[in-house]
């Protein structure tokens, strides 16, 4: 705390995960003169949900995740949500390509790798659903190149482990799109934070926990923080505060005391993976294969068998198995859930409990699952799997948003919720899904919510369009812009394009 800029930063970023790193990077590109401070409770960046093994690492483009494409009563499939997620991933690709081109990210293969995305189902009813889904998606330019088959021999060519040992009489179907990716969001977070650290007027503080957010008379924010090792406390006066602290965001939003945050709560869902590092197995599977979730299960619990490339090493991941913990962070406290309950959100919390019995029953069943039952679930995807080849790994915590109704009730929101202060001086990010893949789209939403007056031709808009060339263009409607953008970003990122 040696200079006046350090004592009165323009921007404070709370949380050194993929969201804080992405938003900080974008904001610094738009206004390099901003002074910024980033606070992280842990000893390094990207150690919670952004950490490589704490998430699935899918470049979520809604290619293979069946929960984005619900079936209508007439048997047809709704793809509106899938198209939104699909084109939001394009925004991330454009931001990453910009950073690679300018040299901020030296090697794209340090965080992203080509990996086909597949959906696979079995049973006549599920096959009919996947066929209807393919018919709807393949007719749209955003899903150009998607393949479909009900031929077990063809599926075996695409993903051999999924078919070997399977009953040949069982109906199966799969879709594949070869333009999919595997993304190491932990590595990407480190790359973004390293780039930020190299910028002028950027201060990074690890092992630092934000304890207070208080309004000052001039409208700025008094941010009080503690060194978790020494216990020393300091404070700064911030012009704008970005709360991107994952599961800790609920608590920080409550500390800010903004009226817009009243009533929000959190529901934590934990996850467990099975992981295989045996080369003889991992070398025979190159895809992310998503199945169909059980009825009542949350979106993050769609089972999938994935190729993962982390630190240059290829592994396989299967899961997740959902669970319940009262922690809001993997490195959090068992009292997190109880500490988050206030007079303002207890009504919405109780309302959600009453109206989500199916989810509650699902989580209880998952928690009570034995290792045998978990492995049987893997064998539904990989019939010849050997127990000795797989070990258990604990995923990151996902805190789903409980959003208040005006009447005092509430509902469970599985997306990402942006909660800005009325004067745009503070914003909190809540929720977990779809998460890191759409970090650029979420960062743009924050810009539009809190910096709308700067998004003009005589301010930030020209620079923003250099970073995100399709900003302001709906890629769901403009097929040519979509094709051109994907060709350009695939070339820079060295990923597949068709």
Curated annotation (Swiss-Prot):
Pathway(s) this gene product operates in, as recorded in its UniProt entry: Carbohydrate metabolism; tricarboxylic acid cycle; oxaloacetate from (S)-malate (quinone route): step 1/1
One of the Pfam families matching this protein, by short name: Mqo
Catalytic activity: (S)-malate + a quinone = a quinol + oxaloacetate
UniProt keyword terms in alphabetical order: FAD, Flavoprotein, Oxidoreductase, Tricarboxylic acid cycle
Known EC number: 1.1.5.4
Needed cofactors: FAD
GO molecular function: 2-hydroxyglutarate dehydrogenase activity; L-malate dehydrogenase (quinone) activity
UniProt keyword Oxidoreductase present: yes
Superkingdom in the source lineage: Bacteria
SUPFAM superfamilies (UniProt xref): FAD/NAD(P)-binding domain
Record-stated family: Belongs to the MQO family.
Protein name: Probable malate:quinone oxidoreductase
Origin species: Granulibacter bethesdensis (strain ATCC BAA-1260 / CGDNIH1)
